[in-house]
Design a protein with these regions (language model features):
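Short gly/pro/ser/thr-enriched loop/turn and capping motifs at secondary-structure boundaries
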Residues: 35, 112-117, 153-154, 176-181, ...
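Structural signature of the thiamine diphosphate
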Residues: 1-45, 68-71, 136-170
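Short acidic-hydrophobic, aromatic-tinged amphipathic segments that line or gate anion-handling sites
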Residues: 1-3, 126-128, 187-192
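Glycine-rich beta-alpha junction loops
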Residues: 30-36, 84-86, 176
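Single conserved hydrophobic/aromatic residue that forms the stacking wall/gate
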Residues: 195-199, 203-206
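Anionic-ligand anchoring segments at beta-strand to alpha-helix junctions in alpha/beta enzyme folds, i.e.
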Residues: 60, 73-142
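Short internal beta-strands
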Residues: 29, 104-110, 170-173
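Gly-rich Lys/Arg/Thr-decorated short loops/hinges at beta-loop-alpha junctions or inter-strand turns
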Residues: 41-53, 115-119
């Protein structure tokens, strides 16, 4: 912040950035002289604020969606792996809808617990070093893995060279920097609603 007139708008922008897309911290640097109690500050701000260079990216390329659907429908040993991003984006209903449509087994990370009902017979329990044997073995042996809102934490992956060694991996995430950051994936969809990928899976894939 370089002047007191921009304080209110800067804080508004910071809250927008912190709470949209992938939520996270925002640093605001306030010079000491602006904290002087004798300095009068107007905290009115514009209702509509445009943030230069900040835009949540989405990828709604129909060809990429169709390709992901083909990979999913060709699976012999599929697995769905959901993380905290599903909770943060309030996409649990979409996740349940897609999982039921595909009739595939599903596991959650610790941060993703609650995104899918634990009482359902398709749920294999939590994944990772503190997870269930069934979930970990199903992940290791799967031939297609759909990762949704997950960051491939080391408590889940363990040795990255041995993680899902036979699987084609599809990663859906709102943050482009998370794609292939830890685990190299075969197919990615950025910021895509699960509704988009569920529609092609309803149709016969030849």
């Amino acid at each position: 912040i370089n002047d007191r007139e921009s304080i209110a708008d800067t804080f508004r922008k910071a809250f927008i950035i912190a709470t949209t897309g992938r939520p996270g911290p925002v640093i605001i640097d306030i010079p000491k002289d602006l904290t002087d109690p004798n300095v009068k500050i107007d905290f009115d701000y514009k209702k509509n604020i445009k943030i230069r260079s900040y835009k949540i990216k989405t990828n709604e390329d129909e060809n990429k969606i169709e390709e992901a659907a083909k990979i999913l429908c060709s699976a012999k040993k599929p697995m769905i792996y959901s993380g905290g991003g599903v909770i943060l984006s309030k996409a649990s209903k979409e996740l349940i809808k897609l999982t039921k449509l595909l009739n595939y087994p599903i596991t959650n990370t610790l941060m993703g617990l609650g995104a899918y009902p634990s009482s359902d017979n398709q749920f294999l329990g939590m994944l990772g070093m503190h997870g269930t044997y069934e979930a970990n073995m199903a992940m290791h042996d799967c031939d297609v893995l759909l990762a949704v809102g997950a960051r491939f934490d080391d408590r889940v992956t363990g040795d990255t060279k041995q993680f899902c060694p036979k699987a084609k991996i599809i990663h859906i995430d709102i943050d482009p920097s998370s794609i292939s950051k830890i685990i190299e994936v075969d197919h990615s969809l950025i910021g895509l609603s699960l509704i988009h990928i569920s529609e092609p899976t309803r149709r016969p894939i030849i």
